[in-house]
């Protein structure tokens, strides 16, 4: 990735929702700006809102949602454009544990089923191991690659099952 691209979706650590817009308007903003707010894309967004338990909040303002709900809105906004590459900066940081597990399983499924590539930035090593094919460990500033771990023993194992897999603890 060397610049803006329609094939890349970015989800920053903070939700970046506009307080004066409804949730629907926030999650479809990228589609509107790109001229892609078609009935098919809107149907996809409705499915995502339903999947993440936010369908009843589509006309609410961001200030009326919890931090976890806002983070799920940011994820929906990122997925709405159906990018091929996902850049996810601490995407689960505002989520409670149960929601974190459910959303991470969803992202894993989306990546696998739709053949997407994702770059996940996290400080949680168990989260990285649960979600990834490969973990790149960076040094503190300036970031330099310290090591790369290929998680071959966990290939194809979904995030929730990875945590119980005998190889999981060996990656720490």
Segment roles from a protein language model:
Residues 100-115:
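Helical segment within the ABC ATPase nucleotide-binding domain
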Residues 7, 13-18, 124:
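Catalytic "switch" loops of ABC-type ATPases
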Residues 28, 32, 39-57, 109:
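Conserved ABC ATPase "signature" region
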Residues 86-89:
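Catalytic Walker B motif of ABC-type/P-loop ATPase nucleotide-binding domains
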Residues 21-28:
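Short coil-to-helix segment of the ABC ATPase nucleotide-binding domain corresponding to the Q-loop/switch region
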Residues 75:
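Hydrophobic anchor residue at the start of the ABC signature
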Residues 60-63, 81:
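Conserved signature/switch motifs of ABC ATPase nucleotide-binding domains
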């Amino acid at each position: 990735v060397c610049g803006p691209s329609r094939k890349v979706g970015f989800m920053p650590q903070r939700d970046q929702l506009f307080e004066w817009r409804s949730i629907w308007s926030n999650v479809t903003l990228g589609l509107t700006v790109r001229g892609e707010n078609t009935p098919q894309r809107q149907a996809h967004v409705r499915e995502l809102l339903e999947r993440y338990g936010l369908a009843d909040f589509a006309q609410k303002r961001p200030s009326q949602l919890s931090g976890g709900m806002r983070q799920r809105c940011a994820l929906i906004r990122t997925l709405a454009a159906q990018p091929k590459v996902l850049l996810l900066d601490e995407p689960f940081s505002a989520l409670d544990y149960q929601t974190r597990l459910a959303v991470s399983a969803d992202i894993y499924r989306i990546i696998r089923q739709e053949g997407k590539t994702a770059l996940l930035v996290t400080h949680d090593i168990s989260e990285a191991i649960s979600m990834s094919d490969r973990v790149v460990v960076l040094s503190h500033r300036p970031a330099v690659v310290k090591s790369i771990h290929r998680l071959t023993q966990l290939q194809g194992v979904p995030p929730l099952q990875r945590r119980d897999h005998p190889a999981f603890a060996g990656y720490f």
